[in-house]
Amino acid sequence: MPARADEASDRNSARLTGRVVYLAEALQKLHGVKTVDEARQNTLALQTDDDQLIPIVEDVRGRAFRRDDRLRKMRVELLVRRYEGVPAVQIIRVFELTDEGRFELDYWCDICAIAMFELKACDCCQGPIELRRRPAADDR
């Protein structure tokens, strides 16, 4: 029986680097593959540093890249979970990679002091939240 998401072990995880893009736009740029207009922004994918396109499961962590275009402009390292027989990956953690270093990304509510994984109103107070960028230990 395949492992459920909450049962996945470290052997099912990987670290991938690149930029998150819309799959249809990347297929057009990299390979000249044209999709229908309505597919243009349907699927998010990680375009790796060597131009592989890896689809992203759009749960709350994946959806963050749709809701906040700042994330799609960043070079990122994604800690992902892979499932046997599935080409898409599920995001576990997000890191920004810059010349200054590696930074873990999430969203933060200063009022409630809670972290969230996508740009939206705070789950608790319904107030605004901010993109939080914290230096990350090099635990790779």
Regions found by a protein language model. Give the residues of each.
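Extracytoplasmic
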Residues: 15, 41, 71-75, 104, ...
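Carbohydrate-interacting regions of secretory-pathway proteins
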Residues: 60-61, 70, 88-95
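Cys/His-clustered metal-coordination modules, chiefly Zn-binding fingers
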Residues: 90-140
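Structural detector for short beta-strands of small beta-barrel domains
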Residues: 9-40, 80
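Boundary at the C-terminal end of the N-terminal hydrophobic targeting segment
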Residues: 2-10
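Short, charged beta-turn/beta-strand-edge "cap" motif at the junction between a beta-strand
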Residues: 81-87
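Short nucleic-acid-contacting surface segments enriched for D/E, G, S/T with interspersed K/R
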Residues: 60-78
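OB-fold (S1/OB) nucleic-acid-binding surfaces
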Residues: 32-57
